[in-house]
Each structure stands twice: as C-alpha cells, then as structure tokens.
Amino acid sequence: MDMRVGQLDHYNISTRKLKETVQFYEDVLGMRNGPRPPFNFPGAWVYSGDHPVLHINDISGTDKEQRPDSGVIDHVALGARGFEATKKHLTTKGVAHRVNQVPNSTRWQIFLRDPNNVEIELNFETKNEVAV
C-alpha cells in the first residue's frame, strides 16, 4: 500500500460569531476572507496566501452547541514571519498574547486566542529574521 498523509490542509471552527471571527483573522493575523463553495449552510473560508487554511461554519440559527474552546485539540499552530512586527501589531490591536522561545533553538512562538477561545500558536524561525 503506497499511502502517506501530507501537511495539515485546514482547520474548522463552528461558531455563532461568524463576523467577529472573520474580522479577527483578517485584522489580527492578516489573513483574508475568500471564495467558498456554495454549501447549504452559512460560513466563510479564510485564506493565507492562496490556501483556505480556516473553514468557519456559522451555527447561528441551529441547535448546535457553541463549544467554549478547542475541545480536545489544545491549539492550532501556524508558521509565521515578522516576529517583532507581529508582537507590535498584537500589542497595538490590544490582543492578549504570550511569547515563548523553544529551548535550544532559534524558534520563537506567540500564543493568542481568537474570539471563540481557540488558542493559536504562531511559529517564527528567527534565524531567518534581521533582529529578535
């Protein structure tokens, strides 16, 4: 059997806060709301570059339960660039975040939460950046 699983394609959030969630990913993380197939339920696809990395299901008007956080998933990690600029941007936007350096490495992480309390980890390989 010649089979292998590749990289993460996307993650999905079910929310009653569709507009607020899309706005967070656009304004705070610099992603963009983009094309989405005409499913029979409302939602949005949020893109990083040309790839829809976040699918959002709008569960308003349904009896589906709004989960208070990521459930059994602890967090979602995304590769990022511009460590210092990101820290400054988050501070300017008033977004609570914490910074961590991965031991014995040049990798830094910034952790923050979206409007649905999903924890987002941004990973920066700072050896490729001018200053940290």
Label each residue range with its predicted role.
Residues 1-4, 87-132:
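Vicinal oxygen chelate
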Residues 69, 75-88:
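Mid-chain, well-packed structural core segment of small domains
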Residues 1-19, 73-78, 128-132:
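N-terminal beta-strand motif that seeds the catalytic metal site of vicinal oxygen chelate
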Residues 55-57, 121:
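Conserved beta-strand in the GNAT
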